[in-house]
Amino acid sequence: VDSRGMILSRSHNIKEKNHNPCGHAEILAITEAAKKLNNWRLLDCSLYVTLEPCPMCLSAMIQARIGTLYFGAYDPKGGSLSLNYNFYKDQKLNHAFPVIGGLRHFECSKLLSSFFREKRTNYNKN
């Protein structure tokens, strides 16, 4: 979302579908937004995600210089902000941005649980 509130890109995880370990929604959304703006720096842009980003995605956000990150559910297993070593707090990083997490945590957690339960059910049918 840009500084005027316009949605620049939307995405979802295509890691399994495309057999691409980098096919996370955040990476795809950042890439598309940068293309639309014709600029890799997304300083005045905000990123909204359902689940706390993994270290790879948080690294991409730092590289893209995003303005603000908003996320719903925390991910204690793989979330880059919930891990014991939160590299985001490392003072050596060249960019920092506000992170607002836990937004509608219950709803986001429920949405993700339902989504993955359905995927497992469909996978077991095949």
Kindly give the residue locations of the regions a language model identified.
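RNase H-like nuclease fold core
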Residues: V1-E16
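Structural motif
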Residues: M6, S46, T68-L69
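Conserved protein kinase catalytic domain
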Residues: L8, I27-I30, Y70, F116
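A short, polar/charged loop-to-alpha-helix boundary motif
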Residues: I14-L28
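Helix-adjacent hinge/juxtasegments
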Residues: I27-I62
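Zinc-dependent deaminase
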Residues: W40, P53-N126
